[in-house]
Each structure stands twice: as C-alpha cells, then as structure tokens.
From Swiss-Prot:
<feature type="binding site">
    <location>
        <position position="174"/>
    </location>
    <ligand>
        <name>thiamine diphosphate</name>
    </ligand>
</feature>
<comment type="subunit">
    <text>Homodimer.</text>
</comment>
<comment type="similarity">
    <text>Belongs to the transketolase family. DXPS subfamily.</text>
</comment>
<comment type="function">
    <text>Catalyzes the acyloin condensation reaction between C atoms 2 and 3 of pyruvate and glyceraldehyde 3-phosphate to yield 1-deoxy-D-xylulose-5-phosphate (DXP).</text>
</comment>
<feature type="binding site">
    <location>
        <position position="174"/>
    </location>
    <ligand>
        <name>Mg(2+)</name>
    </ligand>
</feature>
<dbReference type="GO" id="GO:0030976">
    <property type="term" value="F:thiamine pyrophosphate binding"/>
</dbReference>
<protein>
    <recommendedName>
        <fullName>1-deoxy-D-xylulose-5-phosphate synthase</fullName>
        <ecNumber>2.2.1.7</ecNumber>
    </recommendedName>
</protein>
<dbReference type="InterPro" id="IPR020826">
    <property type="entry name" value="Transketolase_BS"/>
</dbReference>
<dbReference type="InterPro" id="IPR005477">
    <property type="entry name" value="Dxylulose-5-P_synthase"/>
</dbReference>
<feature type="binding site">
    <location>
        <position position="370"/>
    </location>
    <ligand>
        <name>thiamine diphosphate</name>
    </ligand>
</feature>
<dbReference type="Pfam" id="PF02779">
    <property type="entry name" value="Transket_pyr"/>
</dbReference>
<comment type="pathway">
    <text>Metabolic intermediate biosynthesis; 1-deoxy-D-xylulose 5-phosphate biosynthesis; 1-deoxy-D-xylulose 5-phosphate from D-glyceraldehyde 3-phosphate and pyruvate: step 1/1.</text>
</comment>
<dbReference type="Pfam" id="PF02780">
    <property type="entry name" value="Transketolase_C"/>
</dbReference>
<feature type="binding site">
    <location>
        <begin position="145"/>
        <end position="146"/>
    </location>
    <ligand>
        <name>thiamine diphosphate</name>
    </ligand>
</feature>
<keyword id="KW-0460">Magnesium</keyword>
<dbReference type="GO" id="GO:0009228">
    <property type="term" value="P:thiamine biosynthetic process"/>
</dbReference>
<dbReference type="GO" id="GO:0019288">
    <property type="term" value="P:isopentenyl diphosphate biosynthetic process, methylerythritol 4-phosphate pathway"/>
</dbReference>
Amino acid sequence: MRLSQLSHPNELHGLAISELEDVACQIRERHLQVVSTSGGHLGPGLGVVELTIALYQTLDLDVDKVIWDVGHQAYPHKLLTGRYNRFDSLRQQKGVAGYLKRTESKFDHFGAGHASTSISAALGMAIARDRKGEDYKCVAVIGDGALTGGMALEAINHAGHLPKTPLLVVLNDNDMSISPPVGALSTYLNRMRHSPPVQFISDSVQESVKNLPFMGDAIQEEFKSLTGSVRRLAVPSVGAVFEELGFTYMGPVDGHDIAELTRTFNAAHKVGGPVMVHVATTKGKGYPYAEADQVGYHAQSSFDLTTGKSIPSKTPKPPSFSKVFGQTLVKLCEQDSKIVGITAAMAEGTALNLLQKAIPDQYVDVGIAEQHAVTLAGGMACEGIKPVVAIYSTFLQRAYDQLIHDIGIQNLPVTFVLDRAGIVGADGPTHQGQYDISYLRCIPNFTVMAPKDESELQQMLVTCINHNGPSALRIPRGSGEGAALMEEGWESLEIGKAETLEEGENLLIIGYGSMVFPAIRTAAILKEFGVNSTVINARFIRPLDEDTIHEAAKRIGKVVTMEEGTLLGGFGSAVVESFNDNDIFVPTLRIGIPDKLVDHATPQQSKESLGLTPEMMADQIRNKFNFN
C-alpha cells in the first residue's frame, strides 16, 4: 500500500505484517523529508512509527479515541489520518500544525502542546462514554518524560480507583523527554525497560478453567487472583507500582516489532478496567544521526539529510537572549555559590545546559514538574539559597497557584526568567508567551521587568538576584539586538526606573521589553511625516515608573504603549490604569496582541497579521491621532 493513497487509518486493518512494515518505512521517509526541509520535531515521531501503526490496526478509528500526550510525537498519526498530501506545509502559516488541534482533524480528539495531559483527557472521555452507555475505546499515549508530571500521576491515581472503567494507557518509554528524564520514577521505568516482559496467561487457559464441570464459574475470581500472584512472583518488580495503583500492567514490549505490539494491544483491549502497556522505543529510530544524538535531534531546523548537519543561516546573527542568559548565569554562579539554576526538563531550551556542564552542583532539573520547581525554589530561598528558575512563559502558567501562594504571599526572593516570552512562531497557540505580563503584574510583592536588549538582560538578571523579594524578567525567543556584552562588573538597575531614549514634542511612545526597538523604528517612520516622538523604555511594569511616564504624558498629550503580549490586563492596561488613578486624561493607543489566539507561522508573519511591524504600527498611530 502506498501511504499517499491511504484515505482512512482503518485501511490498515487486514494488512500483512510485511505490508505494515513497508508503511512504516514510508512514514519515516516522508517524516524525514518534510522536517529536514522546513524544520520541526524529529526524534519523537520517528520513535513511535511502529507503535502508531500497530495501535491503529487494532482500533476502529471512526469511533475509538486516541489521545496523544504533548503532540510532538504525533507526526505519524497525522500521516495516517489524511494529512499526507498537506504535510509539506507542516508548521507553516495556514498549514498542518506541529501539535494536535481539534479544529484540524476529526482524529485529533484532544489538543495538546504541554505535557502530562493525555491520561486525564482520555479518562474523562472514558467516564463520559460509560455514563452515556456507549461503546468505544479510549487510549492515552504518553512518554516516559511526561509521566513525571504531577497531572499524569494524578490521573493514574484516579483511573486506578475505577476498576470497571476500561482505559488503555500506552507508555512510550524511550528513556528521554527532550533530554534524559530525571527522578526516581524515571529510574524505575529504566529498570523495568530492561526486565523480562510480563503478559497475560492466555485466553485459552482462562476459558478452559471457566469450562471445568461444576466449579468453573465459581473459581473464576480465585483464578484471576492467582494469575496476578503468579505474575508478581515471576517478576516482582516489573510493573508493581502500576499494579498497586489499580492498573493491569503489560510489558515491556519492543516498540519496533509490529507483530508483538499488535498481539499486546489486542490482549489489552480485552481487559476490563485500566491497563498500562509499557512500550520500549528508540527516539529517532531509523535515522542514525537522530539515534546517536537524541537530544540534538529532538527538534531541528532545516538540515541536510545526508550529513545530518543543520543548514546555516545565510546571515550571521547575534547570540540568542537565552544563550546570553545562560552564559551570564554561569559567570554569576562562579562568583556566588549560593546561586542555583532550576529547570523543569528544559535545560537546552533555556540554556541552563551551560550551567549544567560548567557547575553541575549549582544546577537542578526537576523533570516536567513546574509546580514543584516553583515551590522547591521557595524552600531554597527560605534557607538563604538564591534560586533562579528558568522556564518558558507558557509553561509557568502551569504553576500559577505556586507563584501566588508559595512565593508572592510569602515575599520570597526567587528569580524567574521567562524564556520564549511573546510570539514564538511555528509552535502555535499552545506555546505563545503572550500571557505572562498579565498574569504576573497582579501577584503581590513581585517585581516584574523586561530588557530591551541582551546587555540590559545581564543587568536585570543581577537586579533580580540581588533583590530581596520575588522577581521576574521576560526574554523573547531568538537573537538579540547585537548589544555589547560585559564579562563582569554588572550593576543592579534602579528598580521601577524607566529610561528615556529619544525626546520629541508630538507623541509619547512607551515600549516594554522586546518592543522597545520596534518603538524606536516606528518613531523614525513617523518622523518622516513630521511627528517627533519621545520614546521611553519602560523596563519595569511592576513597579511602573509613574513619575517619568506621567510627566511626559501630561507634557505631550498623546500616548502609545507597545508590548509583545496580550492587551487584556497587559502593559498598556497598567499605564492606562495609572493614568486613570491619577486623573491624567490623555488619548492613549495600546498596541499589542488583541484578544485572539496566535496560530502557527513565522514570528514575522505573526507580527504582520497582528499589526506589530513598525510600518503597520506607524499607520495605526497616524490614523489614531490624525498625523497626516
């Protein structure tokens, strides 16, 4: 069968193992061809090709529901569910999304982008199914890294308490998340991975017992108990945790053997109640470079398929904000042993891998456990440690209660560095960092700031670490502005003090963080129309520099705020609220992300669609204030 001609995943039914293996080769070929050209997640999807094929040929996907955790490993799922011919548009504007979206396909039953949600969603569907008296299978596919997340463990705890609710959890164990997973549970899974497989006593034996004259039915329950005891005695450690939590455990199964996977899934479907099938896979399977470097090939920009090397940018770029942060933190840690960097399974993305390599004693990876990371940092701060929690803006949302309850209310000196703040591009709405300005500015005792460039980032990092209270700074994805960097001798900024960059009498433009340089470029465009602007780098949103901003607003009389975040409760709202509270009534234009989701596209395309380019912002300003 040609994969390009597959119109429905149910067409896998009845194919011979050799034919299914050929489909697997075609999936890998298409997967590699597209990702090498346009970029995307590589290793996760390559590792679940056989798992996906085997699972889908045991299901009726017109009715059965499969929930993929995170979604970055679901490229084979997309190729099997009608998106083969559009797959060239992967992660491109108006193309196939890099994650799962309910609006994209009827086979995407639950959207995702963050980890550890699949078991909860699948269990919810299973409970709804049973309440409605319907009959279909609910399956969650979750990676071993995501299983360290508290939400996944909460769902397992609940599901195990529902012995009459059929639910299949497929544990895709590739011994990795993005980087190697950490923690006792990961160690346990690794030990299980190398243990002999545990399967069921065959259906025929159970049927024979049931058919014994006079007593077959009577000893059915005792037989089930005996079966479990025999399995535990045979291999006492394998699956014991899941069995004790109420799951029937099967595995570990070779995740690249379609025949064995098919037999196991068929057996699992016959069990009533929650079942855990443990599948051992290899991340990056089938592409030697990805198998050899599973961290580096988790996700890739465009690369040469023959050599495995990334295709370099045509124009050299300054270091990224993330890299500057990581390098600066290493230097600060060298000077102060009390500083500790904390990540939640995102060492490479946040550049804390630099600290991990340089000073491992001052580095902590808690796994996919953002809530724990925040409160862990709070506990450290209580004892005189200076924790720096580096985390994506979108992932810090998962620990909002901890920010308020454990850090803010207690006024604990913890530094939060929010990476990927603002528009992130091809990862789409689940990963846009558009909400942190709003959700941080209302938390008691927090000081919140954003640098205009990488040099100011260095100063703000020192400011946060030296501050005797909770603080947060946001940095955008991508390269910096090329500002000169200092190797040492950084000084703290005055908290709550803005910076006036340009003086003009016709318009006041206040930029926050990554929008400061676009504000300067917008002012230059307006100058061509005779509009002279004062441009202020706000630096801080909490506390806001009311003295500087109020004086300029009253003097000039026309105000524009610019931010790379949602307008609802954002930086512009903070400025307008401050004006209102102080009886300053001046016309104000707030520019930022409107009340809408930002879909996957390049960052530049997203900014164009939102009206956030200097040219488009200049047009908005001219229309608002009648600058002709």
